[in-house]
């Protein structure tokens, strides 16, 4: 769910004498989950970075009630964790961020925690509300809808990739072609992602 790392490209080059082939097969929006009782409706990327780095610790600092912000996130082996850290937090996560094994667990925690905030794939928001996200103070806030993610208006959207050691041939090419076909992209949508 993340772009290949430079170190992984070097290993690929050393083992197969190639940099491989990157294929974008879907889009995803990393959404911010809030408890339904939380009055906050939108946050900027900078505010989210402040919240998840521990610089912003109270909801009143971002227009909410006077209560401590409780952080939930993905485990550090997750591509979502890495993407969110690199593109939103831009530093280390706050030590009090509770890491959980999957987006469903993050959603479940936020659902039960009035002052919780979590992040994960946009498809998993049952029982919580999405928080609209703004690039900065002067921008429009966008919810992670299909339209906003597909048009790149939603600021925390990413491609999901497949990597191959070489240009696909034979049955592998047929498989890739199917994934990128109308039928394959329909399946992408059915499982909660967005078509490329």
Identify what each model region corresponds to.
Residues 2-196:
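Exported/periplasmic ABC-transporter solute-binding proteins
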């Amino acid at each position: 769910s993340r772009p290949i790392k430079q170190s992984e490209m070097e290993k690929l080059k050393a083992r197969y004498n190639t940099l491989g082939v990157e294929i974008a097969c879907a889009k995803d929006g990393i959404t911010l989950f809030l408890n339904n009782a939380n009055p906050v409706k939108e946050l900027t990327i900078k505010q989210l970075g402040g919240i998840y780095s521990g610089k912003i610790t109270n909801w009143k600092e971002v227009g909410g009630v006077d209560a401590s912000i409780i952080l939930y996130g993905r485990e550090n082996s997750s591509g979502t964790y890495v993407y969110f850290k690199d593109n939103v937090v831009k530093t280390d996560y706050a030590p009090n961020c509770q890491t959980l094994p999957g987006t469903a667990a993050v959603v479940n925690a936020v659902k039960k925690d009035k002052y919780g905030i979590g992040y994960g794939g946009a498809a998993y928001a049952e029982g919580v509300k999405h928080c609209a996200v703004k690039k900065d103070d002067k921008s429009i806030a966008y919810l992670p809808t299909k339209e906003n993610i597909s048009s790149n208006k939603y600021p925390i959207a990413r491609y999901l990739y497949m990597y191959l050691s070489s240009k696909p041939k034979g049955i592998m090419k047929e498989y890739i072609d199917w994934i990128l076909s109308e039928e394959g992209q329909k399946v992408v949508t059915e499982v909660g992602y967005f078509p490329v």
